[in-house]
Design a protein with these regions (language model features):
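Conserved helicase motor core of SF1/SF2 NTP-dependent helicases
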Residues: 256-272, 277-282, 288-296, 443-456, ...
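Extended, charged low-complexity regulatory segments
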Residues: 1-197, 201, 205-209
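Alpha-helical nucleic-acid-binding subdomain
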Residues: 238-457, 464-472, 480
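Short, hydrophobic/proline-enriched secondary-structure or compact coil segments at domain edges
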Residues: 89-95, 435-443, 582
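P-loop NTPase Walker
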Residues: 1-32, 39, 176-299, 631, ...
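Generic detector of solvent-exposed, compositionally biased contiguous segments
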Residues: 55-72, 206-214, 219-221, 225-235, ...
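Beta-sheet entry/capping signal
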Residues: 92, 206, 215, 248-250, ...
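A structural signal for short, well-ordered beta-strand segments and their strand-loop junctions
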Residues: 92-94, 156-158, 217, 253, ...
């Protein structure tokens, strides 16, 4: 870029920032005025409510509600302007419209900056912005309200703007090794995930902007940006569908540490955070009165910290075969209810054959509980009993024919009759591996709790959910579209593994399967090492070499704390500050944390801990989905076994720039 061009871009930036400042001032005035007006409206209605009819009051309150919503929208817009002020845009496309022979300078940023129908910056989600993400120099097109606009992309440019100052301009064709992308990747330092709008790649954009497929299944390698893509997809859907709001979207997250880690992305994009839950927390809806349920992380801690469990039994409980066994058991229970006598209610004899017919024929398609309600209603009508006594009639039926509608009693009975020894409760909590069995019985009794308000479901780390869990999701959210993201190579559930996530098409038949094969997180040296762990070669490293080889160190038992501190110092000298010391389990992490005696190091041991310090100690299964500039794999006594190879892969693939490994578990590495 010439000096004259740079000066011209600087002037444009100044003009845009000046406009945003004016928009902020105007919006503040508007909000202040409307807030005061709403207060006066409410006060007037309160003071004079006796002068109005109920209809008039409802009409006036509706007007107040409308004004409140408008003000809320203005507050959101104000926040977007404030976020944009210091960096209004990140890219520019020069596009020639062939139909009108018009050359357009299209600046792209987090949100639209417009005044009097003149667009100074376009929202990255706008159709015209696809010119930046989808095309290089040459023929191109975008969708508009008037149809497809054809033309030619003459040039593309990316900007580095910090605190309102234009630092650098990059001529860009958005190749994967372009200078701008490499600079962004090299300097990504944060406690939390950041937005990637300025570096969204074409294969990622395909996922983000897909609105034609109801179900998306994304297989993405470690560091391919799966979670970032999912969050940007949410932001895009909120932009595209104005009837959609944050309460209509639900993310299933592996744990609360991860949920906290991703919590900044949507607000950075000018959107509210959406609903987030874990499978265990969500299951509580179906497992009352048990409020304590073992989380997935607790389950993994139990598995990776001891051998005190029945591997075959857990594998069975997570299999689809287990569902079939439960279905068979329930069908057998149902068919063996003895409708062997008539009952008398309110001086009316209800014949046993009639009740059998109602239960096993007329209302057979309904869940147990609903079936009993319908039967009780029928009997109330026949016996001339008020419907307010329906529950009493229902209780009579349950008692007379010994019909069990308690999911926990049924599950206990199933375990006993199937010779599956042991309780489904441990330390006062429902075991993770028993959640699905209990839920299946709950659904048989009560039906699926349909959450019709949820229109979009995002399932992250999908490889760690069983086929049965996926089927449950599909049934619970019948009206929702799904975005399912995972990586079979990062499966850390030792009892269940997909050969390919594409097999989920059996549950989601109208789905599109997409693979993300490029890794943006780790340096090529680290990618080479992690590829060797699994004996694979299909992962493409986007980061250039950074001249830090993977460091393999043998722990000296008498000097190990000194060794760890030496690596920490070495990383800091190389400008590596966001560091994770990752142990296999929490017990090993506790011992190391105690021995290091360093107040500048944070110990992450619970799922609700949030990362507050630059250096953390964290057990392997909590590190999933996170990334750090440097990673120290602390393996005190070579605790990784052959079955843990995917877990070891996950741990090593958290590193961006530097990876140091104490006591490399050579027994499990692929030859």
């Amino acid at each position: 870029m010439t000096e004259i061009e740079f000066k011209r871009e600087n002037e444009y930036l100044s003009n845009v920032r000046e406009l945003i400042t004016d928009l902020i001032v105007d919006k503040n005035k508007s909000i202040s005025k409307s807030t005061e007006s709403i207060y006066e409206q409410k006060k007037f209605l309160w003071d004079n409510s006796s002068d109005y009819t109920d209809e008039e009051l409802v009409g006036s309150m509706n007007e107040v509600d409308l004004n409140t919503k408008i003000t809320s929208f203005d507050l959101i817009q104000l926040n977007k302007y404030k976020q944009s002020l210091n960096s209004p845009y990140f890219a520019k496309v020069v596009f020639e419209d062939k139909e009108y022979n018009e050359i357009m300078n299209i600046y792209i940023g987090i949100c639209t900056i417009e005044k009097n129908h003149d667009y100074y910056v376009f929202d990255w989600r706008a159709p015209i912005s696809s010119l930046f993400y989808n095309y290089e120099i040459g023929s191109s097109s975008y969708e508009s309200s008037n149809g497809i606009i054809y033309g030619e992309t003459l040039s593309k440019m990316q900007f580095k703007i910090i605190d309102g100052k234009l630092i650098r301009c990059f001529n860009s064709s958005l190749n994967i090794d372009d200078d701008f992308l490499q600079e962004i990747l090299a300097n990504s330092q944060s406690d939390k995930m950041k937005n990637i709008v300025s570096t969204i790649q074409r294969e990622q954009n395909e996922v983000i902007r897909n609105i034609s497929d109801p179900y998306l299944i994304v297989q993405g390698v470690a560091g391919s940006g799966k979670t970032s893509v999912a969050l940007h997809r949410i932001a895009y859907l909120l932009y595209k569908n104005k009837s959609l709001n944050s309460n209509n979207i639900l993310i299933f997250s592996p744990n609360d540490v991860f949920s906290d880690y991703i919590s900044n992305v949507l607000p950075e994009l000018g959107e509210e955070n959406v609903l987030t839950t874990t499978f265990s927390d969500f299951a509580k809806v179906c497992l009352k009165p048990y409020k304590k349920i073992e989380g997935y992380t607790e389950f993994l801690e139990k598995i990776y910290s001891s051998n005190n469990f029945d591997k075959k039994l857990i594998e069975k409980k997570m299999s689809y075969e287990y569902k079939n066994e439960i279905d068979e058991y329930l069908e057998n229970i149902e068919n063996n209810i003895k409708f062997d006598h008539d009952i008398e209610i309110n001086n009316h004899i209800i014949e046993k054959d009639e009740i059998r017919n109602l239960y096993l024929s007329k209302y057979l398609k309904f869940p147990y509980s609903e079936r009993l309600d319908f039967i009780a209603e029928d009997i109330c009508y026949k016996a001339h009993i008020s419907l307010k006594h329906k529950n009493k009639v229902r209780n009579v039926i349950v008692k007379e024919y010994n019909i069990c509608v308690n999911q926990f009693e049924l599950y206990k009975d199933f375990l006993i009759k199937s010779n599956y020894l042991g309780s489904f409760i441990s330390k006062g909590k429902v075991k993770y591996e028993d959640i699905m069995g209990l839920m299946l019985i709950y659904f048989k009794i009560n039906g699926y709790p349909n959450f019709y308000g949820i229109q979009q479901v995002v399932i992250d780390e999908a490889q760690d959910y069983t086929y049965l869990q996926m089927e449950i999701f599909k049934n619970i959210f019948p009206n929702a579209k799904f975005t399912i993201l995972g990586d079979v190579n990062q499966t850390i559930n030792p009892f269940y593994k997909y050969k390919s996530l594409e097999s989920l098409k059996d549950i989601f038949p109208k789905s599109k399967y997409i693979e993300l094969k490029k890794a943006y997180r780790s340096s090529s040296e680290i990618i080479d090492y992690t590829n060797k762990i699994l004996g694979i070669s299909n992962i493409v490293a986007v980061r250039k070499e950074n001249n830090y080889n993977v460091d393999i160190i043998e722990l000296d038992e008498s000097n190990k704390i000194y060794q760890v501190n030496s690596i920490l110092n070495l990383m800091n000298k190389n400008n590596i500050h966001k560091i994770a010391i990752i142990t296999k389990n929490v017990e090993e992490a506790k011992i190391l944390y105690k021995n290091l005696e360093n107040d500048n190091i944070q110990f992450i041991q619970n799922t609700d801990d949030s990362i507050q310090k630059d250096v953390i100690i964290i057990p392997s299964y909590l590190s999933k989905g996170l990334e750090f500039e440097g990673v120290i794999v602390y393996n005190d006594k070579e605790t990784y076994k052959e079955d843990d190879i995917n877990l070891y892969y996950v741990v090593c693939s958290r590193a961006q720039h530097m990876l140091s490994i104490f006591n490399e578990p050579q027994k499990i590495l692929k030859k």
